[in-house]
UniProtKB/Swiss-Prot annotation:
Region called A, residue ranges: 1-322
Stretch list, region B: 323-539
Entry-linked Pfam families: HATPase_c_3, HSP90
Subunit structure: Homodimer.
GO cellular component terms, A-Z: cytoplasm
Homology family: Belongs to the heat shock protein 90 family.
Locations listed in the record: Cytoplasm
The name this protein goes by in its record: Chaperone protein HtpG
Keywords from the UniProt entry: ATP-binding, Chaperone, Cytoplasm, Nucleotide-binding, Stress response
Xref: CDD domains: HATPase_Hsp90-like
Length: 622
């Protein structure tokens, strides 16, 4: 037998080995993934050669990966029946790195690998990750062309040997003699866990102790017509760690602008609202069935974190690092394609089965609202998916903004909305009175954050979204101009005096007191003067500040609008002349009542004391 040949690693390879061997890694498991990925790649190449070449060594060998463990000898062996390597290929592939070897390249590599060991594979040198756990690595291989087999051997210290080896079948066997602190990689439970996490969907069988351990198929790579509902549901339960079937699933492929295969599921339950805290993203990123990024924060926007599933793209580098994922242009393109496709799917499902979509909306609508407020790029698509009750919708049945548009009056220029704790509370309040009178539909936002959502959306199909508690709402220009003239109410001059007096009396609490052209029956209401901070938005911010221990910051003063036709306001105008002091108490109580109807905070002690004064006056005169 020919003697072993000794080789020195290329200088750049030595540098890389130093990085691998002398650094501490938190993700040591990745070396198993790298070796399995290399085996899968060799098998794929062998499958191609078998189709194009007539003479192939050991042509009847099944294409598979075998893992053998020896706890006593502390070895891990990964074998494949792939394409194998010749002696020269061993030298070229395992002794030389195809890079310029500039100092900056290796400095950057060393720093990045300290943060993320996945970067090793990005440069096509994932094999060297074996030295993370092994103090000696043997590679026994024979090429598919039938040439002499060889053994490559190194301790990762700067040199390697290549020795001819007889009796080898086609393929490659890698034997890792484990370091003292890596003996767990010779135990089947550990290897099973690593395979399940990283290599469950490798397209070739992986056998451990004669048993195939990657039994779940990569359904996303198959045609939809070949897959049953039962297979989809079982796959979802596997990747989503779920017990129930999903409520929605989207399986699609795209070839342009990128090659993408994706299988996404919507769970039936929202675990964030069940007290489990913010859930981590549920979609994993794969490249050719090899896991790149588990629970990826890069492949979908954060507001789609409730989704479970897989995105696979052959266009990505097989071992791209997590740091690179954040800035990678390909990943950004994949993110846009998958996000837009899912939003399109939801829109289609909302039309196909409205009842099922409303169930989805009640469970996961909060995430779509989050998307509107945080992700301008998708606001238009998300706006079509929003659902709210309105003054003309059935009780408890939210509708789309598109449905609202269909019922709009031809001359109506805006979409109006108002927030409240419940539909009943809104309809009992003053803000909808004129809308009812004019038969104008108004959107009911029943969630405290809904005003934030619609203020961020700003418009829908060219129609501006406007909060009905704004000071500049005008539903009828003629009424607005004639607001101070009404024979059934306080006359023009007297009402003007009352407004001036109330503005002075309430100057510490409100920015202005105005005659309302919107109120029909109610005596007064609070309106938002700045056109942005609605009452509900102010409540949300106040609650957030309190939760964070931040001192309260007063917003802009609200305006008080009064209804000169209301009996209480007419009597207040008379009372002001007879008893200005007591009239002041009544004016403050009217303001507090309006504030409470708007959902704003008042001083309860002052309000109760004032209430008793007014009650005492009323009872004493009864």
């Amino acid at each position: 037998m020919t003697e072993a040949k000794n080789y020195e690693f290329q200088a750049e390879t030595k540098k890389l080995l130093d990085i691998v061997i002398n650094s501490l890694y938190t993700e040591r498991d990745v070396f198993v993934r790298e070796l399995i990925s290399n085996s899968a790649d060799a098998l794929e190449k062998m499958r191609h050669e078998a189709l194009t070449c007539q003479e192939v060594l050991d042509e009847d060998l099944p294409l598979e990966i075998t893992i053998d463990l020896d706890e006593e000898a502390h070895t891990l062996t990964i074998s494949d029946s792939g394409i194998g390597m010749t002696e020269q290929e061993l030298v070229n592939n395992l002794g030389v790195i195809a890079h310029s070897g500039s100092g900056s390249f290796y400095a950057e590599l060393a720093e990045a690998v300290k943060k993320d060991v996945n970067l090793i594979g990005q440069f096509g040198v994932g094999f060297y990750a074996a030295f993370m756990a092994g103090n000696k690595v043997r590679v026994q291989t024979r090429s598919w062309d039938g040439s002499q087999g060889h053994e490559w051997l190194s301790e990762g210290a700067g040199s390697f040997t290549i020795t001819p080896l007889d009796g080898l079948a086609r393929g490659t066997r890698i034997v890792v003699e484990l370091k003292d602190d890596a003996h767990e990689y010779a135990q089947d439970w550990k290897i099973k866990n690593v395979i399940e996490q990283y290599s469950s969907f490798v397209s070739f069988p992986i056998k451990l102790k004669g048993e195939v351990v990657n039994t779940v198929q990569a359904l996303w790579s198959r045609s939809k017509s070949e897959i049953s509902d039962e297979e989809y549901n079982e796959f979802y339960k596997f990747i989503g760690n779920a017990t129930e079937d999903p409520s929605y699933r989207l399986h699609f492929s795209a070839d342009a602008p990128l090659s993408i295969k994706s299988l996404l599921f919507v769970p039936k339950e929202n675990f964030e609202v069940m007290g489990f805290g913010r859930v981590e993203p549920g979609v994993n990123l794969y490249c050719q069935r090899i896991l790149i990024d588990q629970h990826s924060e890069n492949i979908l926007p954060g507001w789609l974190r409730f989704l479970k599933g897989v995105v696979d793209s052959e266009d990505l580098p097989l071992n791209i690092s997590r740091q690179s994922l954040q800035d990678n242009a390909l990943v950004s393109k994949i993110r846009r394609v998958v996000t837009k496709r899912f939003l399109k799917y939801l829109a289609e499902e909302a039309t196909r089965d409205e009842s099922q979509y409303l169930q989805f909306w009640s469970t996961f609508g909060i995430y779509l609202k989050e998307g509107v407020t945080t992700d301008y790029e998708y606001q238009k698509e998300l706006g079509k998916l929003l659902r709210f009750e309105t003054s003309k919708s059935e009780l408890g049945v939210p509708v789309s903004l598109a449905d609202y548009l269909l019922r709009m009056n031809p001359d109506q220029e805006k979409i109006y909305y108002i927030n409240g704790a419940s539909r009943a509370a809104i309809e009992a309040g003053p803000y909808v009175e004129m809308f009812k009178k004019k038969d104008i539909e108004i959107v009911y936002t029943l969630d405290p954050i809904d005003d934030f959502v619609l203020s961020h959306l700003q418009e829908f199909e060219g129609k501006k979204l406007v909060s009905a508690d704004g000071a500049d709402i005008s539903l009828d220009k003629e009424e607005a101009e004639d607001a101070l003239v009404d024979e059934s109410g306080v006359d023009k001059a007297e009402l003007a005096e009352l407004l001036t007096w109330m503005k002075e009396e309430l100057k510490d609490e409100v920015g202005d007191v105005l005659s309302s052209h919107r109120l029909v029956d109610a005596p007064a209401m609070i309106v938002n003067a700045d056109g942005f901070m609605s009452a509900s938005m102010e409540r949300v911010l106040a609650a957030s500040r309190k939760e964070q221990g931040i001192a309260g910051v007063d917003g802009s003063k609200k305006h008080l609008e009064i209804n000169g036709k209301n009996p209480l306001i007419k009597q207040l105008a008379e009372l002001r002349k007879a008893d200005a002091g007591f009239a002041g108490e009544v004016a403050h109580q009217i303001l507090d009542n309006a504030m409470i109807q708007a959902g704003l905070v008042v001083d309860p002690l002052k309000m109760v004391a004032r209430n008793y004064k007014i009650l005492d006056r009323a009872v004493s005169r009864a």
